[in-house]
């Protein structure tokens, strides 16, 4: 939990369907190094001193996984014990990497290293399931809002991208629609129950 006058320091691991424990460790290492380097950037010119003090004391990281449901190991499809073991290994590896690099950089070791966040925007940019959630369906329409005065939005309208005025702000905003096909054999919301999703959340919370 963040203190008052404290900010996140997030870095993201994109999980792919073919990732195994070794490739995940490599990604975790790089994301942790990046986060630890970001934790050195505490010269906040326009904020009160308490922001700098909190950032330096806790040196927080937020190494997150997105695309969990695209991977058999991390989605629990290979069994609960394998998932729990993998999460413990990855967490320990992130903590050890942070410890090593914090010492090299002359900063405090992070008081928190790992997290899981929804990652809605990142998942769209890299085409993966969002955070620890399944994809919606095999085929669906993704909508994206844009300002009617934005040059990119204007170009898209001129080039024939499907669009319509926004219901909420029809004079200033448009909504573009994109057809999306999810990867074959991915987990979609109709293939996992609410209880199974909560069990997965619990595993990530505990490990």
Regions found by a protein language model. Give the residues of each.
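Internal maturation/activation junctions in enzymes
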Residues: 42-49, 67, 72-118
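Terminal amphipathic helices with adjacent charged low-complexity linkers/tails
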Residues: 61-65
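Catalytic alpha/beta core of large soluble enzyme barrels
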Residues: 1, 11-18, 28, 32-47, ...
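A short, ordered amphipathic alpha-helix with a cationic face
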Residues: 57-59, 87-88
């Amino acid at each position: 939990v963040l203190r008052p006058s404290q900010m996140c320091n997030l870095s993201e691991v994109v999980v792919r369907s073919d990732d195994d424990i070794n490739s995940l460790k490599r990604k975790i290492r790089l994301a942790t190094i990046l986060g630890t380097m970001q934790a050195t950037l505490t010269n906040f010119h326009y904020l009160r001193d308490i922001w700098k003090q909190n950032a330096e004391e806790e040196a927080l990281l937020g190494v997150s996984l997105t695309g969990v449901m695209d991977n058999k190991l991390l989605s629990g499809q290979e069994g609960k014990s394998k998932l729990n073991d993998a999460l413990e290994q990855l967490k320990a590896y992130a903590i050890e990497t942070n410890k090593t690099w914090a010492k090299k950089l002359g900063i405090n070791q992070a008081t928190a290293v790992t997290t899981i966040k929804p990652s809605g925007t990142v998942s769209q940019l890299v085409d993966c399931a969002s955070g620890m959630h399944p994809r919606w369906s095999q085929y669906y329409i993704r909508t994206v809002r844009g300002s009617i005065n934005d040059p990119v939005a204007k170009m898209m309208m001129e080039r024939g991208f499907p669009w319509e005025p926004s219901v909420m702000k029809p004079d200033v905003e448009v909504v573009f629609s994109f057809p999306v096909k999810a990867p074959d054999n991915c987990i979609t919301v109709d293939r996992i129950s609410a209880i199974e999703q909560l069990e997965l959340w619990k595993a990530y919370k505990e490990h």
